[in-house]
Swiss-Prot record:
Belongs to the HMGB family. Residues 5-71 bind DNA. This is Mobility group protein 1A. It is found in: Nucleus; Chromosome. The gene is HMG1A.
Amino acid sequence: MAEKPKRPLSAYMLWLNSARESIKKENPDFKVTEIAKKGGELWRGMKDKSEWEAKAAKMKEEYEKAMKEFERNGGDKSSGASTKKRGKAAEKKKPAKKSKKKDSEDDEEEDESD
């Protein structure tokens, strides 16, 4: 069975992927997070985003067609991927450990020494 189509990138992500190298060249000491921040600033300052929005819209249409085809062919019933959680939220969390409280005797000793 075919794999579920991946969601399309947003206009911003398409642009950032193409602009990332030039941002790195202009700012070689930037970390990944700083590159993303700079990219966000540049994106917000852009006047004409129509090229990237058109590319994103085309990718979204292709994704929607692929999803319809995927669902028509039975979807992903066997693996249950649609109900599966991803990332840290999917991991079972252990209950938090109780913090040890300071002995009340210590508190009383501090009060007496004042």
